[in-house]
């Protein structure tokens, strides 16, 4: 929430590279949840602006709510699809889940995606009573670029240039906690932190030549310009630029074998939040790549846990599971809420 001067983002024509994923042939909805599909939190192009809400089928509200946008390197406007396993895990633990989509980098450049996400939060808060939700327990979560969205929601509260005027206005877009799976946090350092050989794999997989510094790589496409030639824009789109003591408690998870977003991006985020005095836990999981499914796998994984400003602190080596995640959210947002 520290205020920085936001440069004007100038769109640079970048040829289409990353095809958007088509709709799933058969979407499996979360068990144990009542679904409200196709809600519109703002009028946006394509599938952007869509929100699917899943409320626990057991118990009584108002339920705490987690907003989740599925990662895609900002190349898809279908962030409301793919988070169904997350919604199922959280719904059985007493949390409502809103899966929502923002504009892709082809539809609009930064800060449009943050404007969209804040509009989604305002929509949820404005309709909390109608949907049986607790407006004072709103959490942002996501993976990869979706984790970036969640983190930006956490660290940019009070930034007028990032609030936008989409959808419902006059309602707070503040979130009370963040869960971040392997998000990019400092665009200018990503390439230098890649694992040995990872840039070769990245270049081959995504059709680029200069790893994350390429004009057609995810980050440059997001800001509509080269991150190297326009470092001011790259910094403005990096969560690290906004961190201060008022940011919400944050749980971070990253695998050490991630060849898409290096785990040092999460190390930087943890260090910055720690320095600002923000309650934070960081789970660094050995031999795990760009994938959050380990949290539901039941496997025992070598996990290094760092924490700051948490009482009690998580124990060393604690396995990150959905029980651990919801216990963190319970502690940081006002106590347990479980189906009865």
PLM features per residue range, with description:
Residues 108-129, 323:
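Alpha/beta-hydrolase active-site loop
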Residues 119-200:
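Primarily recognizes the serine-hydrolase "nucleophile elbow" in alpha/beta-hydrolase
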Residues 246, 252-254, 258:
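Short beta-strand/loop motif that positions the catalytic acidic residue
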Residues 62-71:
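Short beta-strand element of the alpha/beta-hydrolase
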Residues 251-253, 263-340:
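C-terminal catalytic histidine-bearing segment of alpha/beta-hydrolase fold enzymes
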Residues 25-34, 44, 154, 192-242, ...:
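Mobile cap/lid helix-loop segments that gate and shape the active-site cleft of serine hydrolases
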Residues 80-98:
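Short amphipathic alpha-helix adjacent to the substrate-entry channel of hydrolases
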């Amino acid at each position: 929430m520290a205020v920085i001067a936001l440069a004007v983002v100038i769109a640079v024509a970048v040829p289409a590279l990353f095809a958007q994923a088509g709709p799933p042939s058969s979407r499996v909805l979360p068990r144990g949840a009542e679904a409200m599909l196709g809600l519109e939190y703002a009028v946006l192009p394509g599938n952007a602006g869509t929100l699917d809400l899943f409320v626990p089928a057991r118990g009584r509200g108002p339920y705490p709510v987690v907003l989740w946008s599925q990662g895609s390197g900002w190349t898809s406007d279908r962030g409301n699809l793919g988070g169904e396993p997350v919604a199922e895990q959280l719904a059985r633990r007493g949390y409502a889940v809103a899966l929502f989509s923002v504009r892709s980098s082809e539809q609009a450049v930064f800060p449009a995606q943050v404007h969209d996400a804040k509009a989604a939060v305002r929509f949820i808060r404005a309709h909390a009573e109608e949907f049986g939700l607790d407006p004072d327990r709103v959490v942002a979560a996501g993976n990869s670029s979706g984790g970036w969205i969640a983190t930006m929601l956490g660290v940019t509260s009070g930034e007028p240039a990032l609030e936008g005027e989409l959808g419902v206005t006059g309602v707070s877009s503040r979130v009370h906690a963040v869960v971040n799976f392997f998000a990019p946090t400092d665009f200018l350092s990503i390439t230098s932190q890649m694992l040995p050989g990872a840039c070769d794999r990245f270049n081959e997989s995504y059709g680029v030549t200069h790893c994350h510094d390429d004009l057609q790589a995810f980050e440059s496409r997001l800001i509509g310009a080269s991150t190297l030639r326009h470092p001011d824009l790259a910094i403005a789109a990096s969560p690290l630029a906004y961190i201060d003591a008022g940011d919400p408690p944050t749980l971070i998870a990253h695998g050490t074998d991630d060849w898409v977003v290096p785990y040092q991006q999460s190390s930087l985020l943890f260090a910055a939040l720690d320095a600002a005095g923000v309650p934070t836990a960081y789970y660094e999981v050995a031999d795990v790549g760009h994938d959050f499914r380990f949290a539901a796998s039941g496997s025992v994984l070598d996990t290094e846990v760092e924490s700051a400003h948490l009482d009690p602190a998580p124990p060393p080596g604690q396995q990150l599971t959905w029980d651990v995640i919801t216990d963190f959210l319970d502690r940081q947002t006002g106590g347990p809420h479980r189906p009865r």
